[in-house]
Amino acid sequence: MKQLLSYTLSMIFVFLIFSCNTSEKKKAPQQDEGTQVQSVQNYSIDTSGVSIKWTAYKFTEKLGVSGIFDQFALNLKNDHGSLETLLEDAEMTINTVSVNTGNEIRDPKLRTSFFKIFHTDTIFGKILDTKEGQETLELKMNNILHNVAYTYSLKNDTLFLTTHLDLRQWNGVEALKSLNKECYEVHTGGDGISKLWPDVDVVLKFPIKMNL
């Protein structure tokens, strides 16, 4: 009888321990799930505040000359979500006639001596990949499609997307020569060399709002 009582108490004790362990294991996933949900951030873009800034370079020492485009259209496939989600498959068309450097003498020359020779009335861009380390966009100029890398970062309430272009990849040499000939003197540096580089840096700014 004593052995039976001892055996019964032992089984009850083991059952209680097993039940406690099972309860703890069930609670753990709930805590992890709650933490994961809280880490997901939800953003949206104020499309009315988007801007495009480009910087080209003259002189041997590469002095930057910057400008913007006043007319462009942005097509977002996703109007809210993470930064990666907002950028996914986003498209942009840019009217090159709207090029604006704030210089009334320079701007007409850019239209006639560069973009006209470049056969590019409209620049078309599309985000192809937003994965970290694989950020790629497609850019069409001079009837040529070419993929380029980009980076993006969030600073305060603005999403910055930056990319570097080599216009030679879109057969832009003749257009560069045409513009440099038109602006020969203003492209001549202290070394007496007139130089217009094929490099262009582009920065897109997207005002971001965090949704609750």
Task: Go through each PLM region and give its residues.
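Bacterial N-terminal signal peptides that target proteins for export
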Residues: M1-L9
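C-terminal motif of bacterial Sec signal peptides marking the signal peptidase cleavage site
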Residues: L16-S19
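Low-complexity, acidic/polar, glycine-enriched regions of mature
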Residues: N21-L212
